[in-house]
């Protein structure tokens, strides 16, 4: 969320407060008032949550940290683990996920064997593309691979979300058959690990604005 929270009064180039991560808990049928996540997840610079595992123990975040030589203005993708009631300090994702290009959104499948992320690095189809790394049998991760056609276009693809069924991918794109700006699409992975042609979720989920 972008709002004054006492952590910092700094604003970005558009005059907005920096993003920070908040949480709310469901009590009975109501949600509690949002609270600022404690350190070390938030810093005085921009930090946003990208993905929280189903068991609530693993978090991917996008944050600005000038201690690392990544992305424009030091923005990269970081990971944190929950240890009891506390979170570990965010550590930058390795395996060539972060580069000097722009890496933004990220998500994982239910079993944490596939990580999808967004990058405008060289080797893509144009704009921002969806990329992935896979966990290998020896426990290490593969090199990043562009998801390619039919997922990526010459325009921007963003915000991947892997459904718990293990085969359905939701993402946003200004390409494909967008009816206006970034639309939400879905694609399914078949038994031969090929992605189906993305389907626009249509109105009223997507609009012309």
What positions do the PLM features span?
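Short, conserved micro-motifs composed of acidic
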Residues: 1-209
């Amino acid at each position: 969320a972008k709002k004054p929270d006492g952590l910092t009064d700094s604003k970005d180039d558009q005059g907005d407060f920096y993003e920070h991560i908040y949480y709310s808990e469901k009590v009975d049928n109501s949600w509690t008032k949002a609270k600022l996540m404690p350190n070390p997840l938030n810093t005085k610079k921009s930090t946003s949550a990208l993905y929280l595992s189903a068991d609530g123990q693993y978090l991917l975040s996008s944050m600005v940290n000038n201690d690392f030589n990544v992305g424009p203005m030091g923005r990269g993708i970081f990971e944190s683990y929950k240890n009891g009631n506390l979170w570990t300090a965010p550590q930058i994702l390795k395996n060539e996920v972060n580069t000097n290009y722009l890496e933004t959104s990220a998500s994982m499948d239910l079993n944490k064997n596939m990580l999808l992320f967004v990058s405008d690095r060289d080797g893509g189809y144009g704009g921002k593309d969806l990329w992935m790394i896979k966990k290998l049998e020896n426990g290490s991760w593969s090199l990043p691979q562009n998801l390619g056609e039919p997922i990526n276009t010459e325009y921007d693809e963003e915000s991947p979300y892997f459904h718990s069924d293990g085969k359905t991918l939701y993402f946003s794109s200004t390409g494909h058959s967008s009816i206006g700006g970034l639309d939400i699409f879905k694609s399914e992975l078949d038994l031969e690990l090929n992605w189906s042609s993305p389907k626009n979720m249509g109105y009223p989920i997507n609009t012309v604005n």
